Amino acid sequence: MKRAILLTWDVEEYDAPADFGARPLPDGGLSRGVAIWRQWLEISARWKIPGTVFVTARLAEAAPDLLRETGQRGHEVASHAWSHEPNVDLQLAKSRGRITELAGAAVVGFRSPRLRLVPLQEVRSAGYRYDASSNPAIVPGRYWRIAQKRKPHLDSGIWEVPASVIPLIRFPLFWASFHLLPLPLYLAACRLLMAWDGLLTLYFHPWELSELREKEIPFWIRRRSKARRIERMNTLISCLGEYGEFRTVRDYLGV
């Protein structure tokens, strides 16, 4: 079986600077989030690969045309809860229903904002078939989850699809590592994991490929220009495509 690459994106209100201490934008980052999403569709068009897009219902309501275009491009549309505000009701069922209505396609996947832990029974009861909120690693200042399983598995009648981590040391290959590591080293780690598991699950945010002027955003993210960050992502996708096949999460699980 050909190795699978699950490239996933969290499409949300632009509140990343606020996460790092900046003053929240007046509209919670809604208008900037729409602009970044539109720009991401332009950037990703050249890749010609399917991915999985977890979008908040609030952003989907603000840009239903972009939501439909995302699905028409061959991407799976999934739920990222109702909004990206911290510590609020995720409205699991309501967000799934609203995104389904706006997208005109069934929504079966869920990822919580900031990978917040949500009981899988609640996710399943809301009508989802899989949850992608697990990053089974140590992320300083965020969480310690090395006891969680590393590969997709059924739990409480629902699929759990963890983000990829290096075995044994549990080093995460999530979005931050992409910016922190030299690209050849990051690619080598991805290839190692594909050889080991036959699967690579990555997640990023469209805002990572946008103009980042806010001084509160850490230097390790904004040290490269927007053009350079896009170029690195283009290179990553091109190189990974030589080792595996890009698929949506739903297609991979067969749900």
Segments (PLM) and residue ranges:
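Catalytic alpha-helical scaffold of carbohydrate-active enzymes acting on polysaccharides/glycoconjugates
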Residues: 1-162, 166-168, 185-255
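Binuclear metal-dependent hydrolase catalytic cores centered on His/Asp/Glu-rich metal-binding motifs
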Residues: 171-184
